[in-house]
Amino acid sequence: MAIGTYTSIITLNVNGLNVPTKRHRLAEWIQKQDPYICCLKEIRLRPKDTQRLKVRGWKNIFHANGKQRKAGVAILISDKIDFKIKKITRDKEGHYIMVKGSIQEEDRTVVNIYAPNIGAPQYIRQTLTDIKGEIDSNTIIVGDFNTPFTPMDRSSKQKIKKETQV
């Protein structure tokens, strides 16, 4: 991208997209916000249902879905930017997707993670270790990490493990 330009990104946990009205409202909201990239977590679509997620002006929609209606992540890239896809990496459980490509000859990588509720710190650590060779200064990592980083972020009095503390 040229100097002085930016990439606008929205990231949302949508808590399921199986209801048509919810998909329609989400599509309208994305169009109104008008970002270049939109990352969705917890889409909960089965692989055979992913064609149901459509947004006018967004042909590049990439999913990672489990076999059941659990987890699921998506990266949507607006038609307004000339994003050339080079590589897509997904996990089979639908917890992360990585899209590598370029915008105006400049490499970009977007990683969208939805960590499982149980074992989230270990999952995040392992995922980042697995993709370490793909991460560089042009990598954007977003997600729902299901991990409180400070006691203030926790709703219960449960002790926070040292590995997740900031």
Q: Where is each model-derived feature located?
A:
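A shared catalytic/ligand-binding motif for oxyanion handling
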Residues: 1-166
